[in-house]
Amino acid sequence: MPYPDLYDEPTRSRRRPWWVKMFLVVVVLAILAAGGVAGVIWYVAQDLPPLNSVTAYQPSLVSRVYSDDRQIVGQFFVERRILTPLSDIPQSLIHAVIAVEDARFFEHPGLDVIGIARAGWMNLRRGGKVEGASTITQQLARALLLSPERTYIRKLKELFLAYKIETVLSKEQILETYLNQIYFGQGAYGVSAAAQTYFGKDVAKVTVPEAALLAGLPKSPNNYSPYKHPERAKKRQEHVLTRMSDAGFLTPRERDEAAAQLLSFRHGMPAQTAPYFMEYIRQQLMAKYGETAVYKGGLEIFTTLNVRMQTAAEQALRNGLRQLDKRQGWRGPLRTEDIAKVVASAPPPSDTPVKKGDTMEGVVTKVGKDHVMVQAGSIQGKLLFDDMAWAKRRLRGRDLARDVIVAPTVKGLLKPGDVIELAVKSVDRDAVSFELDQTPVVEGALVALDPRTGAIRAMVGGYDFSRSEFNRTVLARRQPGSAFKPIIYATAFNAGLSPATVVLDTPVVYEQEDPDKTWKPENYGKKFHGMTTLRSALTHSHNLATVRLLDKVGVKSVVDFSKTVGITSPLNHDLSLALGSSSMTLLELASAYGVFANQGFRLEPYAVGVVQDQAGQILGQNLFAPRQVISTETAYLITNVLEDVVQRGTGQQAKSLARPIAGKTGTTNDYTDAWFIGYTPNLVVGVWVGFDDIRSLGETESGAHAALPIWVDFMREALLQLPEVPFEIPENIVFVTVDAATGLLAADHGDQSTVEIFLKGTEPTQSAPPRTDSTRFYQIDQGIDGIGELPAAVQP
């Protein structure tokens, strides 16, 4: 039998122990796992976005618009964000955010292992996800660099990016970027916009309880909104205060005191200031700088808008249009509803009390002999007949410019179930009295300019921007009627005529190209005034005298002069120009009057003075350069005559302002347009009133009746900001006593004489004949159609 090999071991002794096998398995698995992790890391690392969005942080910023006294009056934005340095953010807000979002922010390298473990334990104990573990740096990486998808790969990318961010930015830089980036709800991005949105204050003035409220919002802005869910918002604020106390930022006493304070929230954003003006400059900015710069570039836009004047302009126009609309009569109830249903569905009394002037809809519930009862929401009130008597019906007469007025009765106006517009007249304890109201359908516009600079101080392009965004100050071309006449008379003065030059205001017929047609202009009221001076003709707005003057001065001369003073709209090249038949915008006509107010110097109207980028670099600036386009003497001559329009003519209502004022009314055929353009040495203001669809405003609704009251109401407030200064008299203007009827030297200084102004060298040298000399009328009639020989410079 063979001997066993001494070197052979038993089979059992050659088997590896189990722990060796286990060790080998673990090693292999570890290698595989490490390889897998390395592969995942490699894969994730290959697809990481660059850090440019973080290291060169350029968020979408609000472009802010400022008034002439540096008040913020508007904003343009995609995301309402105001970039704020960390040094300008109060410590209480910084502490609140850190405490609730990432208490170990200054201790970890971008991902917080301890925080992850704590959050996992808390979630395990409470049986669900009640606490997150994302650090501030992770949230920043997610917001700036990653898509919103919820996948494990995205989470890994978030961790890697957070670590990388911590290697290139300081903790302070990360925190500043985060506080400017995060969304707080209500359209507010970043802490500054959030402070303005919720509390209406600068972020630097935020208190501890307010800071805690804000810090609790980013987790879920909708769920913790103090407007939608006040109880949840309060609990969230208390949670933040507790975390601040746990982190050592507050003592327990400070925490309790902060939690006990009542917060006052800003309810709704304020109504946009000067919406027509804002849209006007927005279009200009978009054309010059582009959409990205305007809506995301954080531009600082300094405008010419005067807030007090703008407010006065809006109120004056709205009040004037409402009064005019009521003069036109009532258009009837809005609709009819079932009274029982209205009363049954009336809401509970509101915590907000009504006040005088508030407007609302109401339903007529009962009709009496001299009053009606109305239900307006939760309010029951009375409407007396005297407070609805304006609601007369207007019946169109045969003459398109005339209406027949029919007086109303209560039962003739209203019946139960009628839905009507109401305005609160008075509130006496629990009793509310109403007056019948009506939203105007008539439109209007007002623009105010500083003639010395061209700066637009106020602009209202219509009754209500939300109803119509069409800006009637710059887009609506309408016939100015007699408001154009000063340009014709200024052309004559510029050519050497004087306010004392006489002209015949008598019937005249002009042949047209068609031999079967003639044109016969008429005066307002169909009256004639015979021989009259240019001063009197313009003061009293005589059409026939103006047509004769235009005929002799020359249409081309007036058209050229119009362009010189700023009229850019095309003008009719015929004698109808004398009656203001050529359409133009309110802004261009007001700007033309500004040349008269500014002693012959023209400046282009402008609304934006300076535009800066977010770093303060000037991108654009209005460097206004005045150009003298007519002589100082011509400007004063026309101004002096237009002062007479206010003192003795169609603009007499403006006398109540007791300031040096010049101006002119304008009314077109059938009262379709009403104008008043007036000025002082430091402000020129134009008002237009009319329907968009060009129809009559009604009989008597002339410029003096429809537009001038609005102008006066505005100027009463606007002039409070401006010093009283006289119109400066040029050296070459001389004063001469003349005969009021003929414009010649007065034979005596009795009642028939007046002091007139002349450009030196144009004053009369011939004395007026005795009034009994009837041959004088024959002599005048033998002149050039009632004006006499014109200077050579203006011979047609």
Functional labels for PLM-detected ranges:
Residues 1, 267, 338-350, 366-370, ...:
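Soluble, non-transmembrane domains of envelope/secretory-pathway proteins that act on or interact
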Residues 1-66, 104, 124:
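N-terminal type II signal-anchor transmembrane helix
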Residues 97-98, 244, 313, 369, ...:
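Active-site SXXK
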Residues 106-116, 189-192, 251-254, 470, ...:
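Short, well-structured active-site flanking segments
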Residues 125-150, 204, 271-273, 452, ...:
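Conserved catalytic neighborhood of penicillin-recognizing serine enzymes
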Residues 128-379, 549, 556, 560-564, ...:
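Non-catalytic, structured segments within soluble enzyme domains
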Residues 262-263, 270, 305, 564-629, ...:
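Active-site-proximal helix/loop microenvironment
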Residues 277-293, 444-479, 490-491, 597, ...:
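Active-site beta-strand/loop architecture of penicillin-binding DD-peptidases
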